[in-house]
Amino acid sequence: MKPSNFPMPTVDAVLAKYNLNNRYYDFSCGWGVRLLSALKNRVAYFGTDPNYELVARLKQIHQDYDLVNSTISSVDIRATGSEVFHPDWENTMGVAFSSPPYFDLEDYRIGAQSIRGRDYRGWLGEYLQPTIDNIKRYLVPGGHLIVNIKNYGDYALYDDTFSLCESSGLTYVETLILDNITRPSAKQDINTDEKIMVFRHGDTEKSSPLDLFVF
């Protein structure tokens, strides 16, 4: 398995369904697909990524987009990991949605990457847990945390992320299925579908884990 670009139609669908207050936090910015979806859908975009060179390029994408489209978009991207808390974002975000870095798979060598100097348990405790805790503080009541991640190899990334979200007091809502055949690196003869977990900050009627919606 190797990293691949995230399909923009999925981001569009998530924002259409879960955009609560027009403020979207992308906790692992990646190569800009989620940023472009936010720009296209006129949603204020807030992002973190430790790769400072990537952050500079994303800011340039924002400037170029506004120049070409004669728009004034709201974008705030910070060159930190998502485990770093930003007090001015507390209780402001309606939705947090991203595909976080996979342990031992995605290390882009620039900035304070989440895997550096950590084994898997350290990554869970020092990166993923504080990331979830921060997002819970960023979300307004009724806001949603939406995570696209999957188990791979010996690492139960999906299962452990799900457990950490529940133990943090977030309420499970539903599971979406990303038909990953739309990704550039997907192979036609291999099922690479991925689950997208949805949690809510605050009480809600729980869905069954079998209630799936396919993008």
Where are these regions (language model features)?
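Class I S-adenosyl-L-methionine-dependent methyltransferase catalytic core
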Residues: M1-F215
